[in-house]
């Protein structure tokens, strides 16, 4: 068999990877987890369980919903519909086809259902099975996720954002003293289920406990306890301890001495030992808990108390007459003076009372006695009356309602998470499968609430990440599915009851439209299903990792207070403290930290390295916020020696509550994996983040997401080392699926022969079709370009093509430019930016934007609209770009007003005059009237047509253009098929050749003789088809040839079949919206060069608008003649405190000067002045150990590497672990520059030096998506507002600029009366005046008269609504 590695080039593709000089000191033990796996795991693994066999599916997601809804039975229990299994068919169209045809990328869900029909004997009631029918039922199309974690809905890419919500369970809190005027803390508890009714328990100002269900009217908490079946005695016994007072003749009562119940106070009577009679402390002396413990230790068991001490205590059991056993007082009653006399008279020796003291208050006893309900029935009826006011309360209805509220699995679900949280908070041990409330839960919630009131325990922190969980895509859609299936269940039951069950089949019962509409509604309209932010790859990744507290079941902006929005200590390593929007959503929309992941319960986990006996191991453990509270966790930058031991006497550690403590090394449990785990992906791309103010860092991370992909990409010289990970995980770059060898490359596709062999030993072929000039959601350009050459050997997951904003597999959002910090004639006032003409001339910041325009030809009442070139009253000049069908050519340069697609619409006929009638009678029928309804280029748009798509309805004849596009597409499919076949044929026939050479022929084509031994030359004379006709002696060889032939034929057939399917799909016509016959989409690409008014920004929150483009000769320049590209204002720094940008500039300055140094060394090497050793020495000095892999290679590869860094050396300075000021100085020294990073600069206009040294360096700048071209517009005439008759505002309404109150003051100040008058009248809302003005302008006159503005009339009308009549009375003078 032929070796597949026979022509592998020595140099694998991984040698192309960019090497960065890394300033980080902390070794990474864990890689950054895939950045979009949150989305994919949640939907594909947990919800759909896509590629899992039916028998192996876990009971979660779709499986669990179907299991919980089915079986469905009809009311008489005759028919029973059960769920067997589900599976997905392959989607009809792939991702690309769906986006082009405006369809949803979805797969049909097929559910196998079994309908069992029973025969019921009416006399005995026994059931016998009558028949079973099993059938696969179509339940609608379920959207699938693309490989990048997005959904395609109606042709647009959308993302479902994960939601943060309060975890189900029980929460205890107080009102912080805000409700009652005295400032008393009122405690409350709330049970939040995953779905079902909320239960609240609360104290009022009088310390009585109430409960409410779903925030309805409140009832006494003891009513709830009675409703769950507790009697008065059980309630009192459960919540209180009791103590017995024994009568001691003539002395008082002896009672057990319990030191725990003693608080520090002065005694009102003597403390007497009841057993010995000794007085231990006199009245008026102070007793403390410490003293009490001492006496107890010395043997004090019982103390003597005065007779009247019992007054005010509460009975812990019924008080009975010893003689007659008659009940004298009920349990819980207070002992009064009268009752004490009765006790004395009847000589009752023992009285049991409740232990009520400052540590346990009488709240439940007081509530019991305030509550009128004395038994379970009354309590249930009371609850029924509150929840169903106006309905007659009977015990059955009340019991059923109460059961359904909290104890019925169909209506109440705590979820597994809720049960775990409930168990841990109430210290219970109930099985996790019990997801409804239990009697123990309710009893213990009241217990914990009372304990809180008594000062035991602490309230819950709602913003703690142990109490907030994340609902990802899978779970959100699961909830929608449940809603849809519950609705469907009702319709199934109706259909079962309505029809003849014997003849009905499962598909007759199921109406899938209900389910489909619910899912569709979620994806199209839900607040959490959002149009993907596709400005650049970083914005895509950030959008998928976003956590929103808003949305259904979440918070609303207006109600969210400061606490919810604030950073919480548990956010550490889970949620980024930096990246969040400015404005009303601040803190409600967050981003997940780089290393964070979500566990199966929906809590966010962060990774830590385990520390054993003060030794840091490489074991990485993920902890949630709750688990983390149990440990002491050190920082990632704790000093560690060579053996991995923590150095130093004390280590600074985080403990529960976000506090820091100093502990000895052996006490540390974990340390952070890396300092970068604190921040999000966007923030981790900012070098020197640690030197920036947090507000500016927030702006920096937000503005990186608005950077427009440029034509020429350029990775930052000063990066953080995360750039590669972002580019790879975003899906912008193309990754190799398997190891292989590049067979073909052009700008549109890459063909790779894989090295992973199939069972038959033949290679498979991977064809990567690259995206060329596609429009993103935000009209930026998606374009991929190959990085590989023919013959390259690629490994799985190598980057083989760059996408938008990526450079050699690293994210590249902007460009490196030479920046000087210096004021320049006021042109950089208020953060304005001054740029050199070179930037524009060399297209440094030029970007391509693509706009899509669509025209639909519909079938109207008067006849069909037609796409045509024959348009009435249009000059030939206007049609110059259209083909014979009336559609614009690709490559045409268009500007505003040009026709893109010619279209005519039938016009309703006007009444015919007698003359016309006569002419028609003579000259025959004239064609019906049509009006021009062509698609024109809107104002403000110009560019080149890059793509045209034509879609025709099924059954409508295709026009020439559609056929041409189709033909082009078929040729592309054929080329893919032929190339794949060619690679397989090459392999198969070279293998055949190896088998046949040296064999003896028994039979074969005419050219060969029987008995001959086969040689290579002989085979060269045969055609490929004749190889199969040869028969040889060796039976084993013949068997092998047979197998190869079979595999080859199968492969060929599969390829032909795939090709035929694609062609058939292409030719079959399209599913267009109702009434549409043809749809034409035209894409126009516009090149946006940088111009004044465009917004630019750095990565440190330093943003500004371009004020002027200066000729190169006028810009400041360096002593060697290099012209500065951009001049920034130094005043933008001190107040904003983003010093990171200065350090970046200095390191960038070192970068280009080091590159110059390397280039000089290479030049000298080529001139034979120095050897390769000097270059190696310099590279080691610069890069350290990173460079060893390069230095081991041949000399020419080292020189090739040096050429790659000739523009600038790339640095990585990781967040919080990067270069310090000294490192930057060292690099400047190594580059031969002044350590201050400042240089002498010459003014381009005068040719003189500036007075002071200027900070100059390479800085990474971004062009943001706020382009002046999209903002500026002008209005000539346009629409007016209906009521005020003033022009509308805004570009989209073609509106005017508002001349407001302050602007009027300005004209008043200058006394410009006539200008002011025309502003307020004819240019605004004087309707008659503006019509007359328009007339006079048309006639070429310049006079106008202004009348009364409409807003004055509106004001008069408003006065009239207040019954005030304003009249203008002219009095004669």
Curated annotation (Swiss-Prot):
Entry GO terms, CC: DNA-directed RNA polymerase complex
Entry's Gene Ontology molecular function annotations: DNA binding; DNA-directed RNA polymerase activity; ribonucleoside binding
E.C. code: 2.7.7.6
Domain of life per record: Bacteria
Record keywords, A-Z: DNA-directed RNA polymerase, Nucleotidyltransferase, Transcription, Transferase
GO biological process: DNA-templated transcription
Pfam families linked: RNA_pol_Rpb2_1, RNA_pol_Rpb2_2, RNA_pol_Rpb2_3, RNA_pol_Rpb2_45, RNA_pol_Rpb2_6, RNA_pol_Rpb2_7
Reactions this protein catalyses: RNA(n) + a ribonucleoside 5'-triphosphate = RNA(n+1) + diphosphate
Function: DNA-dependent RNA polymerase catalyzes the transcription of DNA into RNA using the four ribonucleoside triphosphates as substrates.
Quaternary structure, from the entry: The RNAP catalytic core consists of 2 alpha, 1 beta, 1 beta' and 1 omega subunit. When a sigma factor is associated with the core the holoenzyme is formed, which can initiate transcription.
Record's protein name: DNA-directed RNA polymerase subunit beta
Source species taxonomy: Bacteria, Pseudomonadati, Pseudomonadota, Alphaproteobacteria, Rickettsiales
């Amino acid at each position: 068999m032929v070796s597949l590695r026979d022509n592998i080039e020595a140099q694998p593709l991984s040698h192309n990877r960019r090497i960065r000089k890394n300033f980080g000191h902390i070794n990474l033990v864990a890689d950054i987890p895939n950045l979009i796996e949150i989305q994919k795991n949640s939907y594909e693994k947990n919800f759909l369980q896509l590629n899992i066999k039916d028998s192996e599916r876990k009971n979660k997601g779709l499986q669990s919903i179907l299991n919980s809804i089915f079986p469905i039975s009809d009311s008489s229990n005759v028919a029973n519909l059960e769920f067997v299994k589900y599976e997905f068919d392959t989607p009809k169209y792939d991702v690309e086809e769906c986006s082009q045809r405006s369809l949803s990328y979805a797969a049909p869900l097929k559910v196998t259902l079994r309908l069992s029909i029973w025969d019921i004997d009416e006399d005995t009631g026994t059931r016998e099975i009558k028949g079973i029918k099993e059938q696969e039922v179509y339940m609608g199309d379920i959207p699938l996720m693309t490989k990048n974690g997005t959904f395609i809905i109606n042709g647009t890419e959308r993302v479902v954002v994960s939601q943060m919500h309060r975890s189900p369970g029980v929460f205890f809190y107080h009102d912080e003293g805000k409700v009652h005027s005295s400032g008393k803390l009122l405690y409350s508890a709330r049970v939040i289920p995953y779905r079902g009714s909320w239960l609240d328990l609360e104290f009022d100002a009088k310390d009585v406990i109430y409960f409410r269900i779903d925030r309805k009217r409140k009832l006494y908490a003891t009513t709830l306890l009675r409703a769950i079946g507790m009697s008065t005695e059980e309630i009192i016994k459960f919540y209180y301890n009791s103590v017995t007072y024994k009568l001691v003749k003539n002395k008082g009562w002896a009672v057990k001495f319990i030191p725990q119940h003693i608080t520090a106070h002065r005694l009102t009577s003597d403390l007497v030992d009841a057993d010995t009679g000794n007085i231990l402390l006199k009245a008026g002396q102070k007793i403390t808990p410490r003293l009490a413990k001492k006496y107890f230790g010395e043997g004090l068991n019982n103390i003597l108390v005065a007779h009247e001490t019992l007054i005010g205590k509460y009975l812990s059991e019924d008080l009975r007459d010893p003689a007659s056993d008659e009940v004298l007082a009920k349990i819980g009653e207070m002992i009064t003076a009268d009752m004490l006399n009765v006790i004395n008279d009847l000589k009752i020796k023992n009285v049991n009372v409740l232990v009520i003291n400052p540590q346990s208050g009488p709240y439940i006893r007081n509530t019991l006695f305030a509550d009128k309900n004395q038994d379970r029935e009354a309590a249930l009826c009371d609850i029924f009356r509150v929840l169903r006011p106006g309905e007659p309360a009977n015990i059955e209805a009340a019991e059923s309602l109460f059961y359904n509220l909290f104890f019925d699995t169909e209506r109440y679900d705590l979820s597994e998470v809720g049960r775990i949280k409930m168990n841990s908070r109430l210290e219970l041990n109930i099985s996790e499968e019990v997801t409804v409330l239990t009697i123990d839960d309710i009893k213990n919630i009241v217990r914990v609430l009372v304990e809180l009131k008594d000062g035991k325990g602490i309230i819950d922190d709602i913003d703690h990440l142990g109490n907030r969980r994340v609902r990802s895509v899978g779970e959100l859609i699961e909830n929608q599915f449940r809603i849809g299936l519950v609705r469907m269940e009702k319709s199934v039951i109706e259909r079962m009851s309505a029809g003849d069950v014997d003849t009905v089949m499962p598909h007759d019962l199921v109406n899938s439209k209900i389910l489909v509409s619910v899912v569709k509604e979620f994806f199209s309209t839900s607040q959490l299903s959002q149009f993907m932010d596709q400005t650049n790859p970083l914005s895509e990744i950030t959008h998928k990792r976003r956590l929103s507290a808003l949305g259904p079941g979440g918070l609303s902006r207006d109600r969210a207070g400061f606490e919810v929005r604030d950073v919480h200590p548990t956010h550490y390593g889970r949620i980024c403290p930096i990246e969040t929007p400015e404005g009303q959503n601040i803190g409600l929309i967050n981003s997940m930290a780089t290393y964070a992941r979500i566990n199966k319960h929906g809590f966010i986990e962060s990774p830590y390295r385990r520390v054993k006996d003060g030794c840091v191991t490489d074991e990485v453990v993920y902890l949630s916020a709750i688990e983390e509270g149990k440990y002491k966790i050190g920082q990632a930058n704790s000093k560690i020696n060579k053996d991995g031991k923590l150095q130093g006497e004390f280590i600074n550690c985080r403990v529960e509550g976000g506090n820091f403590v100093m502990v000895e090394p052996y006490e540390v449990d974990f340390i952070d994996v890396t300092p970068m785990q604190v921040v999000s992906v966007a923030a981790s791309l900012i070098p020197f983040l640690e030197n920036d103010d947090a507000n500016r860092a927030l702006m920096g991370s937000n503005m990186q997401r608005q950077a427009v992909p440029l034509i020429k990409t350029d990775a930052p010289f000063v990066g953080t080392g995360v750039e590669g990970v972002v580019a790879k995980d975003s899906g912008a770059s193309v990754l190799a699926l398997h190891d292989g060898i590049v067979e073909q490359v052009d700008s549109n596709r890459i063909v790779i022969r894989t090295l992973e062999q199939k069972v038959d030993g033949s290679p498979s072929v991977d064809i990567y079709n690259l995206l060329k000039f596609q429009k993103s959601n935000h009209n930026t350009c998606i374009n991929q370009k190959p990085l590989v050459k023919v013959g390259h050997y690629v490994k799985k997951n190598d980057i083989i093509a760059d996408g938008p904003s990526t450079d050699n597999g690293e994210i590249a959002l902007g460009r490196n430019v030479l920046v000087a910090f210096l004021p320049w004639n006021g042109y950089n006032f208020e953060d304005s930016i001054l740029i050199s003409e070179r930037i524009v001339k060399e297209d440094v910041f030029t970007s391509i934007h693509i706009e899509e325009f669509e025209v639909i030809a519909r079938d109207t009442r008067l006849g069909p609209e037609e796409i045509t070139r024959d348009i009435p009253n249009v000059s030939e000049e206007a049609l110059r770009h259209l083909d014979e069908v009336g559609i614009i050519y690709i490559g045409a340069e268009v500007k505003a007003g040009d026709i893109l697609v010619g279209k005519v619409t039938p016009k309703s006929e006007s009444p015919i005059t007698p003359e016309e009638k006569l002419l028609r009678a003579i000259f025959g029928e004239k064609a019906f009237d049509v009006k021009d309804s062509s698609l024109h280029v809107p104002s403000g748009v110009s560019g080149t047509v890059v793509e045209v798509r034509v879609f025709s309805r099924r059954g409508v004849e295709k026009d020439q253009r559609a056929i041409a596009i189709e033909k082009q597409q078929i040729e592309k499919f054929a080329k893919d098929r032929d190339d794949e076949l060619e690679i397989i044929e090459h392999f198969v026939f070279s293998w055949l050749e190896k088998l046949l050479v040296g064999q003896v022929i028994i039979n074969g084509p005419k050219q060969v003789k029987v008995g001959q031994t086969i040689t290579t030359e002989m085979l060269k004379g045969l055609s490929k088809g004749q190889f199969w006709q040869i028969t040889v002696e060796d039976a084993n060889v013949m068997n092998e040839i047979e197998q190869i032939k079979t595999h080859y034929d199968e492969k060929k057939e599969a390829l032909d079949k795939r090709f035929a399917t694609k062609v058939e799909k292409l030719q079959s016509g399209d599913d267009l919206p109702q009434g549409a016959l043809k749809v034409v989409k035209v894409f126009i690409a516009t090149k946006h060069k940088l111009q004044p008014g465009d917004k630019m920004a750095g990565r440190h929150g330093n943003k500004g608008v371009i004020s002027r483009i200066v000729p190169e000769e006028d810009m400041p320049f360096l002593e060697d003649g290099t012209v500065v590209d951009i001049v920034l204002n130094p005043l933008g720094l001190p107040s904003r405190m983003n010093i990171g940008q200065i350090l970046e500039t200095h390191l960038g300055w070192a970068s280009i000067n080091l590159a110059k140094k390397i280039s000089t060394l290479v030049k000298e090497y080529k001139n034979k002045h120095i050897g390769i050793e000097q270059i190696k020495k310099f590279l080691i000095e610069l890069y350290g150990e990173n460079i060893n892999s390069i230095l081991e290679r041949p000399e020419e590869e080292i020189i090739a590497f040096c050429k790659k860094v000739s523009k600038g050396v790339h640095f990585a300075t990781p967040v919080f672990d990067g270069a310090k000021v000294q490192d930057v100085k060292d690099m400047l020294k190594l580059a031969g520059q002044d350590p201050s990073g400042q240089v002498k600069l010459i003014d381009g206009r005068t040719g003189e030096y500036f007075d002071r040294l200027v900070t100059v360096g390479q800085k990474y700048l971004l062009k943001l998506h706020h382009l002046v071209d999209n903002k500026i517009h002008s209005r000539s005439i346009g629409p007016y507002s209906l009521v005020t008759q003033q022009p509308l505002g805004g570009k989209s309404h073609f509106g005017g600029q508002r001349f407001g109150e302050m602007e009027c003051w300005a004209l008043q100040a200058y006394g410009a009366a006539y200008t002011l008058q025309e502003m307020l009248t004819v240019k605004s809302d004087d309707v008659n005046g503006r019509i007359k003005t328009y007339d006079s302008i048309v006639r070429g006159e310049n006079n106008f008269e202004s009348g009364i503005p409409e807003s004055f009339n509106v004001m008069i009308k408003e006065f009239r609504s207040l019954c005030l009549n304003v009249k203008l009375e002219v009095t004669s003078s």
